[in-house]
Amino acid sequence: MASYDENNAKAYVLEKGDYVISINSDSHTVLDQKTYTVDKDVVYKGENKRSSDDTAATNVFEDAKGDVTYLSRADHFANYEEATAAPASAELGEPYVSEYHLNSNFDKTTYLNDEDVMPTTGADNGLTLADMRDADYDDPRWEKLLDQLTVDEMANMIAMAGYQTAAMDSVGKVATLDFDGPAAINNNFTGVGSIGFPIEVVVASTWNKELAQAWGECMGKISQEMGAEGWYAPGMNTHRTAFGARNYEYFSEDGVLAGNMGANAVEGARRYGVYSYIKHFALYEGNAKMVSVWSNEQAIREIYLKPFEISVKQGGANAVMVSWSFLGDKWTGECSNLMNTVLREEWGFRGMALTDFFRNNGHGFMNADAALANGVDVMLSTFNGEENNVANPEHPTSVLQMRNACKNVMYTVVSSWAYDGEHEETGMENWKKAGIGIDIVIALFMAGMEVLVIRGYKKRKNAE
């Protein structure tokens, strides 16, 4: 129940007072209620973090405020006229203009550090990814496993992650598949799809967490039957405006409702060994690229990040898809405060982060170097190009970043159905084994038929 105070404490604060908590049959009828008294203000700062956080939250999105006046409740909305008046003209401040220029002319050596030391690659430590099933993120064996990776394997994994994660022979990692989207599972390459479910708005309108979990279970089961380990869903953004182009993919304008629906859907899919890419992280504004979203720290945290936060903390989400949006003047995938400080450090997220659809050119504003340096792991690209590849793959900084990214991917993948039970040792599902067997039988049959045809032809030729 704490609110975020961005101006004074710059932290979550639970104000002193009497809090009435009630259970209602509807918005007017109270079935039961209790009053809880907080004797003094509680500031969740420094070592006194909220119980759900790994580290205490503090202001990190000051640059997203922009040069605007925000409506305030102070003195009964005293600044209402100023905050809501249409401006006669508007001019973007110089710091923002400069940042946009840097985004469009990104120097791919920006994040390289010549003091970094090259890590071990290509080692023979005798480990496979299957050995890390159920291992903690901080298990020291990860370092030994990562030492086995080659630079080429890591670079390929990162560059070509469109609807898949690539195989890595050095650690016995199998290739996995990811399918889209929130209301139905679709394979964009084969055209095979599942039945359609109601859109997320309808799911949220039930206010039924059990139903949301059952929906996630259905999606997980269908994904598994179609051979996919990853699901590009659920959509977790907030209905910021009624004209949002993809509102149908998102649950609600209420972050708590959306978060509870999403967390249960994620949990449901995970019961079938499917990891969910909660998307589009974060503050996605419709269906446009490079649209800047301006907001303040309190609104960002209490409204727009809330669904993602609940899905991570309560649903155990271990994959996210990053948005095309700019948070202020910076692409969300290049915003370390979003991808690292909040997502990983504050919320305790462990897993992989994927860009939105990348093509091969990053649409002019996304690139692998900026992404890796700021907490994004892989590019949703199905075409090989310059921007989805690391520019300096032999530099120690790049190798360290690629190594960390591959760890995040493998940590997520090894939790999937690709590594449970029947295929834990080989990393291969029975249906794939059967398919390979059938292919071999057909190939042998065709080869035999070819031999018979050739022999028959030669006999007829000799007889003539």
What are these model-predicted stretches?
Residues 1-6, 13-22, 26-28, 49-464:
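Glycoside hydrolase catalytic-domain context in secreted enzymes
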